[in-house]
Amino acid sequence: IRDFCLSRGLGDVYKRQRDDKGVFIKDFKADDYTPHICESNGWQYFWSVQHDVDGLVNLVGGKNRFAEKLDSMFTYHPSEDDELPLFSTGMIGQYAHGNEPSHHVIYLFNSIGFNDRTQYYVAKVMNELYKNEPAGLCGNEDCGQMSAWYVFSAMGFYPVNPVSGRYEIGTPLFPEIKLHLANGKTF
């Protein structure tokens, strides 16, 4: 995995930013919102290796350590005096459902066999952060991503790495779904 380095305060690993000369930013704190990270923070971008989740699991120290770190994403809450950007909405700990960089994170529990946690958080987000009303989204509907997440999740699966053709199982809202494909077939 490129562009990772170990930041061993408490044994944690985070994705760290570099300045314009390629030097890692000093005094890095994963929960800071800085100009070095677009619309997010180190907690949220840490998981942005959808193409190599197994490599990230190994970097962190294996499945159990990965599960602990992933759990902490949802339980480590911003403090009251943190200056969160406008788009930090739909927060569950450091998970910001109101902004796209976090959307796939819930489904990463599946990659280490903790499917029940994926199912728990998918249901929590669908039931608590979406409303059937004009302003029913908890964040910015960039290119339809908020709605796409909900539609995929309501059907019970999600493309963590969209280019792989692989889908992760979640928590379907319906006992049966039938998709009518452009080629006339149904799925």
Residue ranges and their predicted role:
Residues I1-Y14:
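Single conserved hydrophobic/aromatic residue that forms the stacking wall/gate
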